[in-house]
């Protein structure tokens, strides 16, 4: 049973790209903690919605998150192809406390150029949202409510002084678990 209210992280001001990178590193640590093996359960699905105007830094945040999670290659914007998939190596401890690497799928969606709400489904991405891994979705509002509920809504806005305001709202229990990890930092 899920509860009706979930946690938020109070608005945080990002004054530079370095601040965005620092936030991404903090988030990566919590994601890695969340995906650690517990009773051989790696079947977690983590879904983030990124909300904000053009040029606010949604792709920049995603790029820093991917790099903080260990991706070393180029991070392309998925604007024209709807989705860029990545395979991340996540270190984990098994039942004997041995360190092993697990491949974690990461799908970066940009729905800005969609012609209609269910285009992401017609493109064959429905199953991606139920498979273990991470889905990061820019412009989720273009899907007009057809996407699964995001664990986190990450809102970015441009302040008058050109800094960014970052606000995080959890919508699920797993989203709350991530926020509790941030509060423990």
Residue map of PLM features:
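N-terminal pre-Walker A segment at the start of P-loop NTPase domains
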Residues: 2-34
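Conserved lysine of the Walker
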Residues: 58
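Short phosphate-coordinating micro-motif centered on Lys-Gly-acidic
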Residues: 1-5, 10, 118-185
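Phosphate-binding P-loop
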Residues: 30-45
């Amino acid at each position: 049973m899920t509860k009706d209210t979930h946690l938020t992280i109070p608005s945080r001001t990002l004054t530079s790209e370095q601040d965005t990178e620092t936030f991404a590193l903090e988030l990566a640590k919590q994601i890695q903690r969340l995906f650690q093996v517990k009773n051989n359960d790696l079947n977690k699905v983590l879904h983030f919605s990124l909300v904000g105007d053009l040029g606010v830094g949604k792709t920049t945040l995603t790029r820093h998150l991917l790099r903080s999670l260990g991706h070393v290659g180029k991070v392309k914007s998925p604007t024209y192809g709807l989705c860029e998939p990545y395979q991340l190596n996540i270190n984990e401890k098994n039942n004997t406390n041995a360190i092993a690497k697990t491949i974690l799928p990461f799908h970066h969606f940009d729905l800005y150029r969609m012609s209609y709400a269910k285009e992401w489904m017609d493109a064959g991405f429905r199953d991606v949202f139920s498979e273990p891994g991470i889905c990061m979705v820019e412009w989720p509002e273009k899907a007009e409510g057809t996407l699964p509920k995001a664990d986190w809504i990450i809102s970015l806005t441009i302040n008058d002084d050109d800094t960014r305001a970052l606000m995080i709202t959890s919508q699920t229990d797993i989203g709350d678990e991530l926020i509790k990890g941030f509060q423990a930092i």
